[in-house]
Amino acid sequence: EEIHFNWQGGEPTLLGLGFFRSVVKIQQQHVPPGKRITNALQTNGTLLTDAWCDFLRKNNFLVGISIDGPAELHDAYRLDKRSRPTHNRTEQGLKLLNKHGVEHNVLAVVNRRNGERPLEVYRYCKRQGVKFIQFIPLVEQLGSTGQAVSSTHLASGGQSPIDLVTKCSVRPRQFGNFLIAIFDEWLRHDVSRVFVQLFDETLAAWGGQSPSLCIFQKHCGRCLAFEHNGDLYSCDHFVEPEYKLGNIHQ
């Protein structure tokens, strides 16, 4: 009964508030009978203002804030184009969301640095008053120049997958230990008070329920991904030339 739009990037707020006002207007004009449209926005929060938050609240946007823990950990990799730290601006965005009553959650990318300090990351998120938390692993493939490249192919030429990812990528066992440490604390203190997506989805699948997160489902393809130029993919985990389904302008 619902049609979900998930606005991601890059940084979707760079499109401007006027763009999203137009989006909502078009959605209202074309929503099919009996359906309801929902919008979610994933942002680093640095461009949020009172005007942005007023719009997001009035139009029932769910906002995900990308923040990787305390400043020391967050700013290790999240610098702006001028190589300036962004943590203070992201925190200010969180405060604005709270001020305006915008529904929001936090997404923390687990990397080689903060992957060693799981409880610091988890407790930091809780201190921000956040009740819903996502953790996703940073896994970037090395290109021939030694720089990160976008690709889904992490094994080639007989090399170990570890040799094919950037130094800032979280290691498999490290990510596992990160989740275990947080799970133990969550189980002791925070069940029904804090919701960690990965734990909820895993427990739902274990209990025989159908998970809502696509990576836990039996079949892929329920969440289409559109690029800014109209290119269409069956999943945002496979936005690669060989997986392109077509273009909506063709």
Where in the sequence are the language-model features?
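Conserved glycine-rich "GG(E/T)P / GGGxP" loop and the immediately following alpha-helix
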Residues: 1-137
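Radical SAM enzyme [4Fe-4S]-AdoMet core and its adjacent flexible, acidic
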Residues: 76-88, 95, 99-219, 225-229, ...
